[in-house]
């Protein structure tokens, strides 16, 4: 694992009244990762936290370098055809000291949404078992247990969690928040029943407060990914759009309010990348997906307050060496 120091530079050339902006610039912040799958930026510090999923750990990237924060997560696998080792998945902060981690290394029904008190910068890493709290969505005779808590979106009142347990339901779960703590974790929106495409994965909160869900769809079916908008209180579907993308893995809004998605493109990963989604809500014109960058198996993305976009990619391994990276993209228009 190597840290590469990154200083975002946007070159603006001015000649009389003409301003030319540089194209988006991509730099590697961290490499040597094993199937990274989640990113969160710590409030107040701006430190970047990454779930190095296949290595079973959470890493902090700060001005001193890259450091383990939580280690020893259980490991499982995901996928058809090529399978990828996974452990911790989605990340979000409740506050500066409280990190929520979606698990992916245990069987459905045993998997946990985990809450941690994060060690201070420079302190020793803690073990995955040292949780402040944990929650499961177990099964019974009539209900399948849930797991692979991939995407986490926090609106301050609840954390919405995409899960991939019961493929006939496609649940987005809801972790209610009160006083900086998770008080309840329950199934909330059966997305497969509503939009008839399975595998909710990327999630985000829109400017109007609605929940945006990216349906990954079948990895053996081309360009079936959807984005859907739901009321966070009632769970009612507000809008649903085809995107023309293969497999949406992440969604994020920029500080300017633009919606971006990562497409893994499982069937043909050469078509994967970062896309800007221009959505005409309340109309039949749908979504215009504009490709911004080609990326090698992207899995997650998030913006800093300054507009820098952090993206994780699995990459293509050579001779068994981990090929995952944390990238930073600057200069997005």
Question: Would you name each region that the model predicts?
Answer:
Residues 8-18:
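Bacterial N-terminal signal peptides
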Residues 53-54, 104-106, 164-167, 215-218, ...:
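Short loop/turn segments immediately following the C-termini of beta-strands
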Residues 38-68, 81-130, 149-162:
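Acidic, Gly/Ser/Thr-rich repeat motifs that build Ca2+-stabilized beta-propeller blades
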Residues 1-9:
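Bacterial N-terminal signal peptides that target proteins for export
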Residues 109-114, 168-174, 221-228, 269-275, ...:
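Structural motif
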